[in-house]
Amino acid sequence: MDQFDKKARAAVENLLFQCAEGTPGDTLLIVHENLGHDYYDANLHRLISNHATALGFLVELFPIEFDPDVKAPSAELIKATSSADHTLFVARLGDQIRFRTDTQNNNKIISYAIDSDTLASEFGIADYKGFEALKVTINNLMMKALSLIHI
């Protein structure tokens, strides 16, 4: 395994074990945009799938078309996400529907690494729990600041 693959595997471990709190044997649905949209790296979903499978996850790929005006996820997607333990969006749709209640049945992850190099970078392998702790600290500071500011 070369250095790139080691980092990519570490990033997938970070996504699946730290962020998703998954375990080997869990099902993982990877929702990805069809080839030709060129927003996400065309190999990213396969790279993640290969490492997830090697880590013991049962992976299913779910290709979608990008729709800039999406109003609701398809019935097929809702059914697929409902039956998976974890859903990883390697698609802009994840951000478009992340607050919808009809897709809240499982653990959703939205990848902001849009290409293989970003996934296998320091960003991709940075400890997810560390980012969560940083987010909590920043939110607490903002809430304290808002209570002290009078407009």
Indicate residue ranges for each PLM-predicted region.
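N-terminal basic/disordered segments at the start of proteins
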Residues: M1-D26
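Generic structural signal for well-ordered, non-membrane alpha-helical segments
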Residues: D5-E13, H37, D41, H45, ...
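Short, well-ordered coil/turn elements that cap or connect secondary structure elements
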Residues: T23, A54-G56, Q104-N106
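Residues at the starts of beta-strands that form the adenosine-phosphate
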Residues: T27, L58, K108
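Membrane helical hairpin/interfacial module
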Residues: V31-H32, H37-A72, L77-A84, L88-F89
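Alpha/propeptide regions of enzymes that mature by internal proteolysis
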Residues: N50-A54, L58, K135-L146
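A generic, well-ordered mixed alpha/beta core segment in the N-terminal half of proteins
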Residues: A75-G130, T137
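Conserved small/polar residues in nucleotide/adenosyl-binding loops
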Residues: I149-I151
